From Swiss-Prot:
This is Flagellar brake protein YcgR. It comes from Erwinia tasmaniensis (strain DSM 17950 / CFBP 7177 / CIP 109463 / NCPPB 4357 / Et1/99). One of its GO terms (biological process) is bacterial-type flagellum-dependent cell motility. HAMAP family: YcgR. Monomer. Interacts with the flagellar basal bodies. Acts as a flagellar brake, regulating swimming and swarming in a bis-(3'-5') cyclic diguanylic acid (c-di-GMP)-dependent manner. Binds 1 c-di-GMP dimer per subunit. Increasing levels of c-di-GMP lead to decreased motility. Its main location: other. GO terms for cellular component: bacterial-type flagellum basal body. Keywords: Bacterial flagellum, c-di-GMP, Nucleotide-binding. It comes from the Bacteria.
Amino acid sequence: MGADVEQDDTEQYLKQGTLAVLGVLRELLQNQTPMRVSHPRGQFITRLLHVDKTNMVIDFGSNDYDNQLAQEANELHIVADTRGARIELILTSLQMSEYEGLPAFTAALPGQLKMIQRREFFRVDAPLNPIFFCYVPWPDGTGEGRLRLQDLSIGGIGMLSEGTVPDALSCGDTIKKLRLEMGEYGRFVVDAQLISIGKHSVVGSKCETVVTPRLSLRFLSLNAAQERELQQVIFSLERLARDKAKRFQ
């Protein structure tokens, strides 16, 4: 599944007016939630530094060229994912400024924003190269399994087994200290709950159908720092997928 959810799994709420918009943005500020700023010529990851009834201040991106392009853009789309909803808003421009002595962008507080609440979280597919692995201590104490990460969200993961899974494994089981090894994006150790056990089918090199177990889990214990880091990974993987798609157009 890509970086979207099915329409039936979403409820869209338009927040209008200063107080409603300010309330949502203050929560993003308090949680230091990463935000993706996109425009026709590029994108970058940032965070809110300050927000009040008239303006919002966001941090500079890490690349000077990206910052220059953002300053020249006439319309910028902002996306931030929380555990409860995806926040989307549009800014007409960014102005260079300073915040606490460091360069920043200032924009007028938007008159509205969209909150997309869902039963399912937005998921992004994990890359096939390099492969990311999940190391799963089986709840029945029979050892540790290595599974391939298939997709990732703030809410949980989908993973594919390279072999069989323990017969005693069942939905609702808690997996302690699940380890995600994601190469350059780092390692995450979290507790998770098994939501479903399914099957994943692909066509093999000899045109045969290969069926492997697929496990879906939801995270139980992400702290604020892990959530921010995981969101950065998701944004990076989304960008990687878009860049790859453009090359094959």
